Amino acid sequence: MGSEKDSESPRSTSLHAAAPDPKCRSGGRRRRLTFHSVFSASARGRRARTKPQAEPPPPAAPPPPPPPAPAPVEAQAPPVEALPSEPAAEAEAEAVAAGPEEDEAAEGGGAEEVECPLCLVRLPPERAPRLLSCPHRSCRDCLRHYLRLEISESRVPISCPECSERLNPHDIRLLLADPPLMHKYEEFMLRRYLASDPDCRWCPAPDCGYAVIAYGCASCPKLTCEREGCQTEFCYHCKQIWHPNQTCDMARQQRAQTLRVRTKHTSGLSYGQESGPADDIKPCPRCSAYIIKMNDGSCNHMTCAVCGCEFCWLCMKEISDLHYLSPSGCTFWGKKPWSRKKKILWQLGTLIGAPVGISLIAGIAIPAMVIGIPVYVGRKIHSRYEGRKTSKHKRNLAITGGVTLSVIASPVIAAVSVGIGVPIMLAYVYGVVPISLCRGGGCGVSTANGKGVKIEFDEDDGPITVADAWRALKNPSIGESSIEGLTSVLSTSGSPTDGLSVMQGPYSETASFAALSGGTLSGGILSSGKGKYSRLEVQADVQKEIFPKDTASLGAISDSASTRAMAGSIISSYNPQDRECNNMEIQVDIEAKPSHYQLVSGSSTEDSLHVHAQVAEKEEEGNGAGGGSGGSEDDPPYKHQSCEQKDCLASKAWDISLAQPESIRSDLESSDTQSDDVPDITSDECGSPRSHAAACPSTPQVHGAPSPSAHKNLAAPAEGQTVLKSEEYEVE
């Protein structure tokens, strides 16, 4: 019953009918769509378009006929759907797995050769080793040559040729494969590390490379090298051989004097700008490594290759970025720093012109900021909205708002800038500039013996003038900086007759002043040289016509021109019976008083000396005839009648008055002069040579005539040399 109903129902007939439906295009097979099948089909389509078309596969065999008893649709649907999807999934997995391999192979094929950045040659990767510090690669030969060059030039630590990363020492060792060069690299690295230690001191012995790290040894500066066989003692402060009982400055001067090289112009061992060859050598101020630089006015900002110290080549001091903007006198380019005169003029100019300049800058900056800031803001906003697709109304609104805000804020910004900038500039001009100049010794301001402030200008570049000679005579100085001839030396002595001579100094850079006088300082000679510094010498010979002479040289040791020296006994030279020389200590006070000088040419000096000699002989004959027959032939020609010779020369102090040229009085009025409160020590008993205007009529008159023996010892002046001839000297 049930089976018949089932067979007669319309549903069962439609499912099991053998005749196909003419409206259905497929043969009755249905397929279920899923997300996996949709995306896998699209992926297969893309791969098919990108990959070259392969040969079509051979036609598959026709499917077997269906079984006679059809299975239900629900039971047969899953196998039908799995048949086409499984090969697609496997093909997709194979394509995904093969994709990265193909990409890596393509990339590997393009990176087979590496281009060296040094020689620009494409090489295989095995010839371009990888570095541990950075990813850059270069060929092995170029790296080896680069390392050799850097080590030989002591440029350690070594950086990558393409970047600033430092190379690993392990890479350097593998690339070099040279033990001696690697040892040199390690030594340079050690020296560079030790140079950064402020307490490290290297042994100054020439054959020793030992260093001593001395912590807290400033109070006990004596160090000893601990290397076996060296044991050199040296100083902690100056890093030189130990100098007992001497300061570092004194030892430095002594070393400079012993190492001084006498060239044609007698240029000493110094760091002067005018001395030395074109290739100048100076030590680093930190590690004392010698550095050579062409003296061609190139850049003066130097960097030590050993310790990395940045210093100025002109002043040899460690510097900062603002060193060449400070009033130190050092320039970024050039062969020498500013002179003292230029520093002082620059300082005075800044001190006087700073208020005017700062006011002018502030007056220009305030309107420029008030007007310029809104204009700048408006242009920036307009350029920002220019490339965008925005409405014109919105753009104009943004520009108007920005300009309005900038107009309100610009006066505030200008006021703050001027309020902060002006005090900073004033503090720099009136604080930093004078302090830096005076700290470096370049201000030239000093106190003049309690008489006020004196400004000293440096006149090193100009010729030596009479005023310079007179200043050197009045204010001799001996300092620790006299290595190159900075000392002005004043030496005086006496002789029986007054005379004037020309003597060329032993050094070409020295202006030598010489004079022969009878018991007084009678004259000076100005012989200018080519050098930068001058030395003042006044020499005299004390002698009898037939007896040997004794010379006294007195060195200036104080600013009051008071000289002390050990001289031979003047008494013995005047006493014919007592010819033994006895040493005595004398003190001569030199006081400047006005008289007259005149300039004569060097070619006429010898003639003028002969004329003065003839005049002196005539005066001597006239005085001898009028003075009586009380004297003998052996008595001194200028012996006073009322005293003995020994008492006259040995027991009395002589006051020597040196004349002052009238041509330089105006120049000396503005400079420091000698104190006028020094009492004159006169002799009422001893006779002294006086002029025609002297009070004592019995004293012989002398006008600078030398004795024949003294005239023979004088050096003849060179042609064209200007000589000072003294017309009148007054001795009290």
From Swiss-Prot:
Classification via InterPro entries: E3_UB_ligase_RBR, IBR_dom, TRIAD_supradom, Znf_RING, Znf_RING/FYVE/PHD
Chain intervals for the UniProt region annotation (TRIAD supradomain): 112-334
GO biological process annotation, one example: natural killer cell mediated cytotoxicity
Any GO molecular function: ubiquitin protein ligase activity
Amino acids binding Zn(2+) 2: C203, C208, C225, C230
Main location as per UniProt: membrane
Disordered, as annotated region: 1-109, 598-644, 660-732
Biased composition (Acidic residues): 100-109, 674-683
Record membrane topology: Multi-pass membrane protein
Top-tier EC class: transferase
Residue intervals of every RING-type zinc finger in the record: 116-165, 284-315
Catalysed transformations (reactions): [E2 ubiquitin-conjugating enzyme]-S-ubiquitinyl-L-cysteine + [acceptor protein]-L-lysine = [E2 ubiquitin-conjugating enzyme]-L-cysteine + [acceptor protein]-N(6)-ubiquitinyl-L-lysine
E.C. designation(s): 2.3.2.31
Keyword Transmembrane: yes
Tissue note: Expressed specifically in natural killer cells, activated macrophages and cytotoxic T-cells. Present in macrophages (at protein level). Ubiquitously expressed with high expression in testis.
Pfam family of the protein (one): IBR
SMART domains named among the record's database cross-references: IBR (SM00647), RING (SM00184)
Chain sites annotated for binding Zn(2+) 3: C235, C238, H243, C248
Inducing or repressing factors: By IFNG and LPS in macrophages. By IL2 in natural killer cells and cytotoxic T-cells.
Residue ranges with Pro residues bias: 54-71
PROSITE patterns registered for this protein in UniProt: TRIAD, ZF_RING_2
The keyword Transmembrane appears for this protein: yes
Domain notes from UniProt: The first IBR-type zinc finger is the most crucial for interaction with UBE2L3, UBE2L6 and UCKL1.
Protein's job: E3 ubiquitin-protein ligase which accepts ubiquitin from E2 ubiquitin-conjugating enzymes UBE2L3 and UBE2L6 in the form of a thioester and then directly transfers the ubiquitin to targeted substrates, such as UCKL1. Involved in the cytolytic activity of natural killer cells and cytotoxic T-cells. Protects against staurosporin-induced cell death.
Family in the record: Belongs to the RBR family. RNF19 subfamily.
Protein's name in the database: E3 ubiquitin-protein ligase RNF19B
Source organism: Mus musculus (Mouse)
Gene name tied to this protein: Rnf19b
